[in-house]
Amino acid sequence: MQGSVTEFLKPHLVDIEQVSPTHAKVILEPLERGFGHTLGNALRRILLSSMPGCAVTEVEIDGVLHEYSSKEGVQEDILEVLLNLKGLAVKVQNKDDVFLTLNKSGIGPVVAADITHDGDVEIVNPEHVICHLTDENASINMRIRVQRGRGYVPASARVHAQDEERPIGRLLVDACYSPVDRIAYNVEAARVEQRTDLDKLVIELETNGAIDPEEAIRRAATILAEQLDAFVDLRDVRQPEVKEEKPEFDPILLRPVDDLELTVRSANCLKAETIHYIGDLVQRTEVELLKTPNLGKKSLTEIKDVLASRGLSLGMRLENWPPASIAED
């Protein structure tokens, strides 16, 4: 095996040992030292927490108002019935939300095969026991809601404000969407030619039958690869935030006093005092303006009224006045 000292080995030997339709052992080698644990732990976490699937989320049972009760003629209490329903393995095609019905009477076990469903639904474990009827006259009728999701979602996390009006008797069930029942991995030593410091990754996986183990690992690897894609072409795609600069002064203060359309007498008096901009004017006080030659109380009242109509007044304090644009003029 020849190659660059910086070149990473890629696993090329994959052995799949099918223990049963729902149980398989996958062996991957050779891997660079340390990569067995790196990849094994990442795949294990995804398989346990992030695999999509279908699960029972709500149940309505005739004659049952809450989960802390029992039903006449049924051997198990309602909590145990709900626990058994959580073990239902369901595959749903083309839908994210379906309702199933179960109607059974007479002595004997009630199993998943007794559930009525349409062609888009497949119950993988039809022999799964839901409860037992103990009397010839006993019966059980229920409506089961199955939804698509990911990982594990407790019933408490699916209670929203609008669910306060949920009908009495509709029982929420903790949803275990993941089709993976058990996952474990082990890292063993591997050898390629003269190299003895390599890893062999052994993954042992069991599912509920809704997905075969090989497909589960394939999907988990796809999820991991898609998440890592962002690092392959790493760059900051955020647009630089453009800070909107606020003007130092209200634009109206930068306008000439002529824009106030004062009488000729008042305008001339202001110009004589070198008051050219509205910003110059609002900084003056009434006392200062009354000292202006030929500007009397009538003109002062006119100026105050015009400023007030624009939300301004005399005696205002303006920091850093005049601005550079005016000072240069």
UniProtKB/Swiss-Prot annotation:
Keywords: DNA-directed RNA polymerase, Nucleotidyltransferase, Transcription, Transferase
Domain of life: Bacteria
Record's catalysed reaction(s): RNA(n) + a ribonucleoside 5'-triphosphate = RNA(n+1) + diphosphate
Chain residue ranges for the region called Alpha N-terminal domain (alpha-NTD): 1-235
Region annotated Alpha C-terminal domain (alpha-CTD), chain positions: 249-329
One annotated GO biological process: DNA-templated transcription
GO CC annotations, alphabetized: cytoplasm; DNA-directed RNA polymerase complex
Keyword Transport recorded: no
Molecular functions per Gene Ontology: DNA binding; DNA-directed RNA polymerase activity; protein dimerization activity
Family annotation (SUPFAM superfamilies): C-terminal domain of RNA polymerase alpha subunit, Insert subdomain of RNA polymerase alpha subunit, RBP11-like subunits of RNA polymerase
EC number: 2.7.7.6
Enzyme's top EC category: transferase
Keyword Zinc-finger included in the entry's annotation: no
Entry note about domains: The N-terminal domain is essential for RNAP assembly and basal transcription, whereas the C-terminal domain is involved in interaction with transcriptional regulators and with upstream promoter elements.
Complex formation: Homodimer. The RNAP catalytic core consists of 2 alpha, 1 beta, 1 beta' and 1 omega subunit. When a sigma factor is associated with the core the holoenzyme is formed, which can initiate transcription.
Known function: DNA-dependent RNA polymerase catalyzes the transcription of DNA into RNA using the four ribonucleoside triphosphates as substrates.
Family stated for the protein in its record: Belongs to the RNA polymerase alpha chain family.
Name of the molecule in the record: DNA-directed RNA polymerase subunit alpha
Organism of origin: Mannheimia succiniciproducens (strain KCTC 0769BP / MBEL55E)
Classification of source organism: Bacteria, Pseudomonadati, Pseudomonadota, Gammaproteobacteria, Pasteurellales
